[in-house]
């Protein structure tokens, strides 16, 4: 007897598959953390891929202790700046913003993204924030950070990207002190996460435009005599006679790509300061020369070259412990074929 088991093609987990509202990914959850306060996210721009030769340090691996070739993604990570501190409170309707403290040292380029406050007292803002913390109305503290793409040569833009980053660890009083120390200053990736640790990488994927159901959902092409009707890359039917409408689960053509996706537990192999050491001959394809600090991540990450990539400490930590990998060779061979 024939096997009638036939699962549906494609996943409904991300429906509706429509374009992302912004190229800046958003996080709605943060890893639990103890100890001193720390920022829990960073952002950079995707440069390209290469490969390295490193020692396999995974315990019980068949190649443990031997040299292996690993594909890596390079992300350029110029320092980010902290523009403001935002306090949240919780009520019966959920979480909402309570107050904000803006720095007086804002980049003029940030004015192309948002309307900058003209007259603002940072000291008065922190005084009001401390009073709110003492009253017990503050539940979370977040930092508003922005990138500095004007320092890059591979990304043709000057307007910064503004994003919200949670401040984790410590008590609320310690978080306020930490916020006072970072507001208006530059922050590096090494202040968030270190080499050998695992991170979640989020980006807006490469846009494919409007695609048919075969490529978009992975349905089968019509076989044999069914393909003679002139519709080989279409679904067999749109559904039953009743109900008198097409169900949303039916695979149809539409937008493919340009959606937010997260890769969990990506290992950070190296955080470097001088990008010229790993720039291949002729530069990275569609990017050019790498001159700023960079991070080397094992495997691939979502999005095309020059796309904004957000990095967050892993929220689903695996069994592997953080160890600084022993990288013996980084390929700088030309990627132009």
From Swiss-Prot:
InterPro entries: L3_arc_euk (IPR045077), Ribosomal_L3_dom_3_arc_sf (IPR044892), Ribosomal_uL3 (IPR000597), Ribosomal_uL3_arc (IPR019928), Transl_B-barrel_sf (IPR009000). It comes from the Archaea. This is Large ribosomal subunit protein uL3. The keyword 4Fe-4S does not apply. One of its GO terms (biological process) is translation. Keywords: Ribonucleoprotein, Ribosomal protein, RNA-binding, rRNA-binding. Pfam families: Ribosomal_L3. The keyword Kinase does not apply. One of the primary rRNA binding proteins, it binds directly near the 3'-end of the 23S rRNA, where it nucleates assembly of the 50S subunit.
